[in-house]
A protein has these predicted regions:
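Flexible, glycine/small-residue-enriched loop-and-beta-strand segment within the central core
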Residues: 1-66, 105-106
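C-terminal/domain-terminus segments
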Residues: 69-99
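Short, basic/aromatic-enriched C-terminal tail that caps enzymatic domains
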Residues: 98-109
Length: 109
């Protein structure tokens, strides 16, 4: 995990044997309101969050972004530079912006 940034308001769970490439961002919240009045004048206390779960044996490529509410299934691979906004199933290769399944991997017996 090199220069990876994990922002956690409520819950980020990273399983066993997970590899995170350099410069990844993992966040379980939107950080702040999009309304400038709320951010600047009223004080931003309404952070919306949803848990992030990265299951066992996942590989996340460099500079990928994993946003709130996402679960990445076990033994999946996320290509470098991907933006993960939806759940990714187990045993697949996924990538892109937004991240989509590219190929399913054969499961070992």
């Amino acid at each position: 995990m090199s220069a990876t940034n994990i922002n956690c308001v409520e819950s980020v769970r990273i399983g066993s044997h997970v590899l995170l490439g350099a410069g990844c961002l993992i966040t379980d919240s939107n950080h702040h309101s999009l309304d400038w009045r709320t951010r600047c004048l009223e004080g931003d206390t309404d952070k919306k969050s949803a848990p992030v779960v990265i299951e066992d044996y996942v590989f996340v490529g460099a500079k990928s972004i994993i946003l709130k509410g996402v679960t990445i299934g076990e033994k999946s691979i996320i290509q470098a530079g991907s933006v993960v906004v939806h759940d990714i199933p187990a045993h697949c290769i996924a990538g892109g912006n937004p991240c989509k399944v590219i190929k399913y991997l054969k499961q070992a017996l």
